[in-house]
Curated annotation (Swiss-Prot):
Increases basicity of active site His (site feature) positions: 291
UniProt EC number: 4.2.1.90
UniProt-recorded name of the protein: L-rhamnonate dehydratase
Cofactor(s) required, per the database record: Mg(2+)
Family according to the record: Belongs to the mandelate racemase/muconate lactonizing enzyme family. RhamD subfamily.
Additional facts recorded: Reaction proceeds via a syn dehydration.
Site, Transition state stabilizer: residue positions: 338
Cofactor binding description: Binds 1 Mg(2+) ion per subunit.
Gene this chain is encoded by: rhmD
Example GO biological process: carbohydrate catabolic process
CDD domains on file: MR_like_2
Residues forming the catalytic site: 318
GO molecular function terms noted in the UniProt entry: L-rhamnonate dehydratase activity; magnesium ion binding
Amino acid sequence: MAMPTIKHVRAFTVRGGGADYHDQDDGHWIDDHIATPMSRYPEYRESRRSFGINVLGTLVVEIEASDGSVGFAVTTGGEIGAFIVERHLARFLEGRCVTDIETMWDQMYYATLYYGRKGVVLNTISGVDLALWDLLGKVRGEPVYQLLGGPVRDELVFYATGARPDLAKQMGFIGGKLPLQHGPAENEEGLRKNLEKLADMRNRVGDDFWLMFDCWMSLDVRYATRLANAAHEYGLKWIEECLPPDDYWGYADLRRNVPRGMMVSTGEHEATRWGFRMLLEMGCCDLIQPDVGWCGGITELIKISALADAHNVMVVPHGSSVYSYHFVVTRHNSPFAEFLMMAPKADEVVPMFTPLLLDEPVPVNGRMKVPDRPGFGVRLNPECALVRPYTH
């Protein structure tokens, strides 16, 4: 039977949660006093939204095939991403066979190279790529993980990212990743508060529970090295994304100087096989964390993961809900997954992209069997108001 072709490509935006998970109401833990690259400025220290972390909003990409099948995906990109999809990328998709994913990715990437490479352009390409995989799964009546070669384990195990690792332990997670609250601009007092927070959590969770620090690009090499060595006393498992993404030399230096047994992780804001090649060949980290909605999508993550495997480096994708679950379950070098605690107080398990997706699975007792519904197995919530700002 002949495969259908792509008939229509549409791009929408939506506000309030969803893929832009920083777009939350007041009082959410993710917008608390958390160290960022902007923490050097006191006026932008108390809230991440104060410097515009949520300005982009969510991008929804919808791709319709000639047989009526519709695939979709969500990522961070908002109106900028919608413009790129409608006015530039759609030409490389419409009329093509739904199986031509590699060619479509290649053309999207090289056509945007002069203004893209990373950032919102790669977010957008990632969203299109994920929608293509969702569409192919629906056309073939298979979950994406089967298209990727099938599962290598029966279930996923998760660590939790959020403000309350002590509650995450009670919920069955294998570890908890804390947002670092104070950066170098807050001097010795900030460093002391960071360590006191870690010590308090270690006291609450005991010795057999992973604790990690998410530093969100906020540190310099000197501070990160001090923090890592001081945190070793409290059994910190890894220190994450300490430095700006382009400081490969700094990451290599940091990794040489952290305590023995502590891992350095990064990659959330890296993109494509070429960016991750730098991290891997320069010995920057022990664990990479590509976001499948930002790094280039599933098509590129396959290549990134293979590179990492050849360097004996684990791949634990950043957040991204079902888009990472379907990948992680198929890879031996992805032994566990991340779950972002999106409840405002990090005190209950709610779907990461709530309220945008329906049927979005969540861990139970820190574990999950990935659903076998076609594609990524989720639906758009019809109660969320989608806006199509551009057409083509």
